[in-house]
A protein has these predicted regions:
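Bacterial N-terminal signal peptides that target proteins for export
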Residues: 2-17
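Formylglycine-dependent sulfatase
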Residues: 14, 22-25, 30-427, 431-434, ...
Length: 475
């Protein structure tokens, strides 16, 4: 049924052979064949998903399948993407490099044309004997690493070139899409179905697989079956304490900290409290729809007897404002809600399942961590270490900061987080800076950057930013 629209080259894949199993250990009950091969990998990505999940402590939202996955994973409670936008974030994740090194600072740049010699995560696994299989959104739409996949690769992107930017139509930005039935007609349902087909086809093989399943929701317009909307009473949908009808810079913060125009929802107009609740309800429904698809894929993984030899990673590609500071998008946000994402890793025999890791981590750690877990040769060029030690001991000491950037109006924004502090600046501080004590001010409402008593903290945070390569530099 139609949805209801409501306003409101293989050459590069050749080469390196198989290697021995590394850190990963299968369960004693696993068969001889499963024990002999390297672990499988299942990647599950969601678009525009912030830590709006039951397992992350959000009361009222219904995410039973992802919550169940969390109970068999290490959940990273302070995981930060390296850019608050789809293309740059995914390019960073899939190369293990900062956005300033990839040169992808927006949704119109193609990673492949900038660094054709780099092995992305799926390409590296393919070169090392994995059947790499894609369904849904893994790289940014239209910018796939075509040759990295045995199956599922998109046609080579746009003649290997960048493309012109596009702007969202303000008249359609507030649309909410209601699906009938279970949403079988939607691309995300179909992506889950194809992932299940991959598991059935490749799960019996001696060749290990890497299945990458990417969901397009809850990206705008929020879309879900009617029954998902029915899970939530709009009158009980909570709004943030710093809600405002339009993007609003908090007192004492730089103007650039909150872009004046929303990029996804309520573009060019104010949001009433009622409209805000309706939109957040739709976002929650879309998250529940994604959760149902995760449940389908995980059920198949278990039914096929693959769970004990498969590393599962769940990740959201960046955060999202749902009214915080009057903002309804991710664009340009260096705030907690713009950069913090769900990040879970289940590695049977390695991960301390069911535990939460309180350490600050960078999401681009995924690539070196999977290489580590699967016993593949370490790859040069990665700009963050494997977080395997935190899978074994989630509370172990970890002093690596998390660095993120944004880029707008030819100005680079930089953010760095440590256990206690969050510092951000624009144009290296010439366009403003902010310092937040995240222990005392988790909502990020007070800017301490100008406090003379904290000058040493500011200096220390700026020293951390030296880890960030200059724009266009090569590792």
């Amino acid at each position: 049924m139609k949805p209801t629209l409501l306003p409101c080259s293989l050459l590069r894949a050749a080469g390196l052979g198989a290697v021995a199993v590394g850190l990963f250990a299968t369960s004693p009950s696993a068969g001889a064949a499963a024990s002999a091969k390297r672990p499988n990998v299942l990647l599950i990505f969601a678009d525009d998903l912030r830590t709006e999940l039951g397992c992350y402590g959000v009361a009222g939202i219904k995410t039973p399948s992802i919550d169940a996955l969390a109970r068999r994973s290490v959940r990273f409670d302070r995981a930060y993407v390296q850019f608050p936008l789809c293309n740059p974030s995914r390019a960073s994740l899939l190369t293990g490099r900062y956005p300033t090194a990839t040169g992808v600072l927006g949704n119109t740049e193609f990673l492949g044309s900038r660094h054709p010699d780099w092995d992305t995560l799926p390409m590296y696994f393919r070169k090392h004997g994995y059947a790499t299989l894609r369904t849904g959104k893994i790289f940014h739409g239209g910018y796939d690493d075509t040759d990295a996949w045995v199956e599922g690769g998109e046609p080579r992107p746009l003649g290997n070139a960048d493309r012109k930017g596009s702007s969202q139509d303000p008249k359609r930005s507030d649309s909410i899409v209601v699906l009938e039935g279970d949403g079988e007609s939607h691309a995300d349902y179909k992506s889950a179905t194809r992932a299940i087909e991959y598991l059935r086809k490749y799960g019996r093989s001696e060749q290990p697989f890497l299945v990458a399943c990417g969901f397009s929701k809850p990206h705008s317009p929020p879309t879900a079956p009617r029954k998902m909307f029915d899970l939530y009473d709009v009158e009980k949908i909570p709004l943030p304490a710093d809600f405002a009808p339009h993007p609003t810079v908090p007192k004492g913060f730089p103007e650039r900290s909150v872009p004046a125009r929303n990029g996804d929802l309520f573009i060019g107009r104010e949001a009433s409290i009622r409209e805000a609740r309706e939109m957040k309800r739709a976002y929650w429904a879309a998250v529940s729809f994604v959760d149902a698809q995760v449940g389908r894929v995980m059920a198949a993984l278990g039914e096929l007897g693959l769970r004990d030899n498969t590393i599962v990673v769940f990740w959201g590609d960046h955060g999202y404002h749902l009214g915080e500071k009057g903002k309804w998008s991710k664009h340009g946000s260096l705030w907690q809600v713009g950069l913090a994402v769900p990040y879970m890793i289940s590695a049977p025999g390695v991960s301390a399942d069911g535990q939460a890791c309180p350490r600050v981590v960078e999401c681009m750690s995924m690539y070196p961590t999977l290489v580590d877990l699967c016993g593949l040769p370490a790859i040069s060029g990665h700009q963050t270490p494997s977080i395997t030690p935190l899978l074994r001991q989630p509370a172990a000491p970890w002093d690596r900061p998390a660095i993120s950037v944004s880029y707008s109006q030819r100005t680079l924004g930089r953010s760095v987080r440590t256990e206690r502090w969050h510092y951000a600046d624009w144009d290296e501080g010439r366009a403003g800076a902010m310092l937040i004590d995240t222990e005392k001010d988790p909502a990020e409402l007070r800017n301490l950057a100008a406090d003379p008593n904290l000058a040493a903290v500011v200096s220390e945070m700026r020293r951390h930013l030296r880890l960030l390569p200059a724009v266009g530099s090569r590792p």
